[in-house]
């Protein structure tokens, strides 16, 4: 008992002693602290000096150094004969100026430093110490830096760290002794900076670690007091990783990073960044607990430099090192968001800040474009701030890929100038159809979906997500915030397939497809599926098919599947068995029905039958078709009829006994229903003899005909019975002499068809049918025969016929009383053969002739085109020339005008570029003052007009005098045997007269025009009353060759001249010898009085009376037509006059009172 109490007291004392020892240790702080060893009798101020130097000792670089060169005993480490000086070593933090724990010579010399030099009796030693646990949580590091940079440089400077692990302390009953410490060597650099590494097990991170430092230099040893630390409280994390910056959708700069790995607790982060732009320079330092930081008010063209470090969020810890600096520069145009991924039908918005030439563009001046091809309406713009513009797109359509671009480019522009940067808009149709079906055992549900209907994006993934409700589906499916993913696998048909197992039949599964992309995620419209409503039942079982006996219906039976328990409807398909079955469908809506009978056309065929089912209420899917069931061919009924048969009679015609061989063809299945086991022949003679003979399966039978009349019947018998409807054939001696066939003809169409026709005579016997029989006379082949209706008079026999062979055709009339006398021919009808042969030759010759004609015509056309191309390739089309506009090349007069050689000599002149008609500017002032002046008849016709009813006055006193008057309604007559209408030709001439001369020229026009035509309905008044006629001096010429009945058209110059040119040359040949064509000659002023007018035929000179006809004729240009200079006669040809079409070969040197530049011109009409 006493021993037990002693042990308890001892243990309690040891525990108190150990606690006391821990309380004597210095708790290591997360920040840096200092170890100072002070010589005895040193004051506090002296102790605060770095390295214990005197107050007046310093050097130029700021470091304190001793003024006394230390004299160490380098002979060894024997301290027995040396004087011993005790240094007091203690720890103090940078914030605390007092020593928190000193090392005295207590309990031995563990914390006592000894020196053998007088140098350390005047100075002290100081070290900076910082300890931390490395980010990988495996090494505890203490960093020891001497504050004397040169004190220990030339001596053996060593630092050791002594530590004791927690498990060692548990085994020791006393305060840790020197032998219980483990020692690690610290790696020191040349600058007296040492790093000590202590391995710490992961399981001991929360335990207390005891340490002390032992510093040796030469013969001096410094030892620190005990230090205690919990490694988990001294963790120094690794710097944050993945520093990244981007502009958010809201226009902020987002700084994001990742936490360092293997950190057992959350961290806080310190972010420092600087912004440098043309307008703002700022720095910031913020501490956050998240792994991101938003910086607002960013500006285009700015540079941001960012660094981040981390530290334990709750509890003590050490800041990590700063991360590597990251620089981010904004562009001159900032889009936020820069990219948008959205679905069809949604509304999205882009924001923009535009910087141009170091100035931010006001938001009101920003315009938006789509793909640089479509300007977005201003109604979609919004001004967010002075510099931020916003555009919104409504009800978006799917983006159409353009080559490798799968997005629309949205440009932010300043008026009409756009920056090359743009925002990207991705619009995807996410309408994905998800279909599910529950298997027939109600144990699993399979869902399928395809992405073929949506546009695929690079680096995008698709995932099916679902949410299961407790019971049924909601009326409007919606995406639930809590959902689960489902693994789906791509199948060979391009569909993804997902399997839900187990399932809850009455739970609603809401599903949607989520498209995950770096730009965001999109969800397809959700759909809700109830497994019980999408059941695909098992196919019906025990399906059988058969043809019922004596009824002849297709009977189909089946068994309902076990699941589901709902009422089912059934669908049956059946058809003739073969490679490609032509199915017929039949629906059965009676849930209790298990069989059905259907009519089929062919009772003797094999039918394939399949059945499937579905819920009667329409929910779910049709099951798969059952395995096919086949009918078995068997006799259903007795044969529908007996076989058709014919006979061959052999024997002496003089005798009454003949051998008759019956021939028949085997019955088909449709007639035998469905097989024939044997044939039976019934005999009936005129002596009432009746008997039957079984011939088995043979199709030939011979019997002896001895009676006057013998009737035979062939019956077909199957497993059901004998045929009911049978054919009878009576052999009668009297009837064999009845002849009703007058003629028989056989016409071969080709080698496979012969037409047989016949003519019958009237008969009192009832004709039943005909038998046509034919055979090749050159061969011993069998006789072929056909049964033909009695109403037919012509029949086509289809067989293989050889034209050079002879064939015998026989036609037998069959009566109720017996077989009549046949009509037999031994060859084809000759006349018809020749006709058909000639027709056949015609059939060959005509196509040959037609083909040859077509080939010859094609050859001629090709040759014509080649010849035309060869000879006329370089000849231009005259209709495309300006001088040929309006000319009718269908008339020979046109070509004579074009190509008759000019009789007068032509002088050379400068060549015009285009052969166009250039009218001359001639002013004409005409009047007849003397009414008594007489004018030749030819001149009368020259000035006659055609508007007799509207009052155009140019002529009075029929054929007696000519007078220009302003009176209206004067009658003009014109005698012409052919009543040919005169033709009025005129030309308008445009001048370049100066404005000062306009009045004079206009007066000339008015005086000349208005005196000849009435002011009311003149045919040329409209042309002269407007446009340039009132501004420039112009003139017109009239040539009379028009019928009196034609009304002169009211046209402008350009229209009227075209119309008149179309009528040019319409001079009937038969009237040329009766009527002359008159032309107006224009001459210069000097030759005006001697001017004459020549007719085409009479060659009579008709002088123009100057005072009565033309009072003034002035040529206003220096150049004019050749005939103006030399002669007033236009055309001296003995046949016909002509108008030159090439004005560049006509010159004129006539001098007038108005001289202008020399020009080529032509006065033609």
UniProtKB/Swiss-Prot annotation:
Sequence ranges assigned to domain Ig-like in this UniProt record: 331-429
UniProt protein name: Leptin receptor
Keyword Cytoplasm: no
Chain positions covered by the region annotation Leptin-binding: 467-484
Entry text on domains: The cytoplasmic domain may be essential for intracellular signal transduction by activation of JAK tyrosine kinase and STATs.
Organism per entry: Homo sapiens
Similarity comment: family membership: Belongs to the type I cytokine receptor family. Type 2 subfamily.
Motif window: WSXWS motif: 622-626
Transmembrane residue ranges: 840-862
Tissues expressing the protein: Isoform A is expressed in fetal liver and in hematopoietic tissues and choroid plexus. In adults highest expression in heart, liver, small intestine, prostate and ovary. Low level in lung and kidney. Isoform B is highly expressed in hypothalamus, but also in skeletal muscle. Detected in fundic and antral epithelial cells of the gastric mucosa. Isoform B and isoform A are expressed by NK cells (at protein level).
Result of altering residue 604 to G: In LEPRD; uncertain significance
Keyword Transmembrane helix set for record: yes
Gene: LEPR
Functional note: Receptor for hormone LEP/leptin. On ligand binding, mediates LEP central and peripheral effects through the activation of different signaling pathways such as JAK2/STAT3 and MAPK cascade/FOS. In the hypothalamus, LEP acts as an appetite-regulating factor that induces a decrease in food intake and an increase in energy consumption by inducing anorexinogenic factors and suppressing orexigenic neuropeptides, also regulates bone mass and secretion of hypothalamo-pituitary-adrenal hormones.
GO cellular component terms listed in the entry, alphabetical order: basolateral plasma membrane; external side of plasma membrane; extracellular region; receptor complex
